[in-house]
Amino acid sequence: MALQNPNGFLLTTIENKIATLEFGHPASNSFPSVLLERLTNELNNLSNNSAVLVIILKSSGSGAFCAGASFDELLAVSNQEEATQFFSGFANVLNAMRNCSKIIMGRIHGKAVGGGVGIIAACDYALATTESTIKLSELAIGIGPFVIEPAVSRKIGKSAMTEMTLDTEWKSAIWANQKGLYAKVFATTAELDAEIM
């Protein structure tokens, strides 16, 4: 089922009890709130679908895996109610992933920032390429990575989470693999896809 709008898209295909859930957005696969809501709903639907055993979560294109939440929407937040609504979008996705009754495998082909790192951490098993660098840049814009912290800390530990939060430089895919975020890292997307199939 394809769910499309000007704020990005979701596409779900089911074959041999494997659901492939692909998201995309022109701004480096970032998530406006409407796309976060659709992703939450689709994860809940797949969790309840008896025809599905495994979910492969991936993003479109060959660039970034996910640039996190929509920066334009963040800049538009002007009060506490809007802030709560904005940050709840990613929290709802991460909770849907955590509560999902299916195994979620992340196919990580490129860079991830902020909420994108949270999505990777919420996957049960994440496979990546050497291009799949990660970064938490929240402090650089005056906020903390509070929404994704529980998921990321569970996956890589408090020490690595603190390092990522305070040292906002890019971390390599090998670093992420050593910390437990990625189960395996491949040299190419073709090798990544061969492992998944």
What is the predicted function of each stretch?
Residues M1-K58, N95:
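Conserved CoA-thioester-binding segment of acyl-CoA-metabolizing enzymes
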Residues L21, L39, L57, S70, ...:
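Terminal peptide-recognition signature
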Residues P26, G61-G63, G110-K111:
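Short glycine-rich anion-binding loops that position phosphate/pyrophosphate groups of nucleotides
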Residues S59-V93:
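Glycine- (often His-adjacent) and acidic-residue-rich active-site loop
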Residues P32-S33, A91, H109:
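Amphipathic alpha-helical repeat scaffolds
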